């Protein structure tokens, strides 16, 4: 009578199967613990999208999660990358005490692209915030419009607007 031996019971095949199992386990473990793409990559992509959509916009330096932007309608502009308690934010300033329509257009277009909401909503929110600054209310106003946090400051040196959205909203 012939005796059949199982292939998995031979010592050579046992060690080979163990080696293959170990290799698959290590490969899977490395794949799961591999570093994911950094948030700055998404922020850089967003800045490139802004330059493609807004004529005259150029990307400047990136320092500590903030991408500085250059545009003829603004003195300073930046795109803030996400952090723990905020999503992106858009900052723009001008030297004029009464901003030009080009300034508002830049702020509205950038915020609309970053937060994927209609441009008219961001335009109205920015204009409303700046128009509310006066002697009685003060020259440093925080407002909320269409789920956006809009902070504007009006001084003798000009107007500064920051538009952001709380994380999870």
Describe each model-derived feature in a short phrase.
Residues 1-14:
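N-terminal secretory signal peptides that target proteins for export/translocation
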Residues 41-85:
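N-terminal secretory signal peptides
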Residues 16-33:
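Bacterial N-terminal signal peptides
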Residues 140-167:
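Short, exposed beta-strand-loop hairpins at the edges of beta-sheets
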Residues 49-55, 87-93, 136-139, 159-163:
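Extracellular/mature segments of secreted proteins
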Residues 38, 57-67, 116-146:
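Short glycine-rich, low-complexity/disordered patches
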Residues 77, 83-133:
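Long, charged/polar, surface-exposed segments that mediate recognition or autoinhibition
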Residues 33-40:
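Sec/Tat signal peptide C-region and signal peptidase I cleavage site
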């Amino acid at each position: 009578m012939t005796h059949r031996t199982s292939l998995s019971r031979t010592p050579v095949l046992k060690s080979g199967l163990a080696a293959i199992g170990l290799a698959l386990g290590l490969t899977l473990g490395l794949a799961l613990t591999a570093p994911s793409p950094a948030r700055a990559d998404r922020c850089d992509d967003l800045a490139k999208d802004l330059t493609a959509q807004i004529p005259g916009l150029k990307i400047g330096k990136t320092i500590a999660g903030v991408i500085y932007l250059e545009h003829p309608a603004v003195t300073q502009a930046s795109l803030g990358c996400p952090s723990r308690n905020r999503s992106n934010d858009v900052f723009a300033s001008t030297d004029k005490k009464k901003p030009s329509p080009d300034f508002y257009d830049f702020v509205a277009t950038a915020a609309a692209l970053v937060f994927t909401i209609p441009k008219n909503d961001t335009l109205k929110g920015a204009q409303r915030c700046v128009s509310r600054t006066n002697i009685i209310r003060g020259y440093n106003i925080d407002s909320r419009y269409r789920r956006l946090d809009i902070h504007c400051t009006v001084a003798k040196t000009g107007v500064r607007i920051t538009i952001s959205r709380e994380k999870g909203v």
